[in-house]
Amino acid sequence: MTTAAKRVVSGMRPTGRLHLGHLVGALQNWEALQRQYDCFYFVADWHALTSHYSNTEAIVADAYDNVADWSAAGIDPAKSTVFVQSLVPEHAELYLLLQMVTPIPWLERVPTYKEQIDQMADRDLSNLGFLGYPLLQTADVIIYNAHYVPVGED
């Protein structure tokens, strides 16, 4: 398999305006990867709902702003597939199937679960969406048969 045939999948949560950290931490890498791989970059709006569910209007607005910023940073829709996660129903379908077969204690043992709860103590994160966040991440990766997944700390 050539590198051009290998697939990269990565997403970004629309939880505010992008800043220099996004450019240096992700977008410069994404821009370079699109020159040699089949790249799928998505607005992770369902991911944003797991912790920012009280302000859905901001998620929608930030999604549009973020995609415009991606374009300014060199993410080219002619070279990469750019999309909004919630507009692809198969994400929800696969996420649901993964929920049906994953024991809750496995999710409670995910190392970042308790760290994230501590870091976002100002929000009520006692919901299935937040607990099942790793399953949504899993669905994002396997639905596109990704070979590489550039990710952040979570």
For each predicted feature, which ranges?
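N-terminal Rossmann-like or analogous alpha/beta NTP/dinucleotide-binding catalytic cores
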Residues: 2-138
